[in-house]
Amino acid sequence: MKVTMLKGKIHRAKVEQAELDYVGSITVDMDLLEAAGIYEYEKVQIVDVNNGNRFETYTIAGERGTGMICLNGAAARCVSTGDKIILMAYCELNENEVKDHRPKVVFVDDNNKVERVTSYEKHGRLSDIIL
């Protein structure tokens, strides 16, 4: 049996742009994709923290070091510039692989620069976890 598990996550990144007249996807700074172990063109789930929208798209690598998070095409209607989003990619594992699996969780600062990468998310308030 296969189990779907969190593979990589970019937590509370700020939407820098939303481009409606663009072929669909989300453009993400390549530094963030690599830190989270997410590939270009990989299917991802996006959750908008500000409005609660959840949707799926795929990634396009953005320029390194820019902090770029840009929703493109129809996905641009699901967010507003300045919103905080959570971007997640998943993988399917065999049951015997689940016990040893650890996702990559990337926390970013206000400029979408990598602040911390961990393989563990403890339950708690953001202020308690990040500081």
UniProtKB/Swiss-Prot annotation:
Amino acids binding substrate: 57, 73-75
Reactions performed catalytically: L-aspartate + H(+) = beta-alanine + CO2
Chief location of this protein within or outside the cell: cytoplasm
Subcellular location: Cytoplasm
Domain of life: Bacteria
Pfam families per record: Asp_decarbox
Enzyme class, spelled out: lyase
Protein's pathway: Cofactor biosynthesis; (R)-pantothenate biosynthesis; beta-alanine from L-aspartate: step 1/1
Names of required cofactors: pyruvate
Keywords: Autocatalytic cleavage, Cytoplasm, Decarboxylase, Lyase, Pantothenate biosynthesis, Pyruvate, Schiff base, Zymogen
EC numbers: 4.1.1.11
GO CC list: cytosol
GO biological process: alanine biosynthetic process; pantothenate biosynthetic process
InterPro entries according to UniProt: Asp_de-COase-like_dom_sf (IPR009010), Asp_decarbox (IPR003190)
MF-aspect GO terms: aspartate 1-decarboxylase activity
Keyword Cytoplasm: yes
PANTHER family referenced in this protein's UniProt entry, alphabetically: ASPARTATE 1-DECARBOXYLASE
Subunit structure: Heterooctamer of four alpha and four beta subunits.
Function: Catalyzes the pyruvoyl-dependent decarboxylation of aspartate to produce beta-alanine.
Family according to the record: Belongs to the PanD family.
Stated name of the protein: Aspartate 1-decarboxylase
Species whose genome carries this gene: Enterococcus faecalis (strain ATCC 700802 / V583)
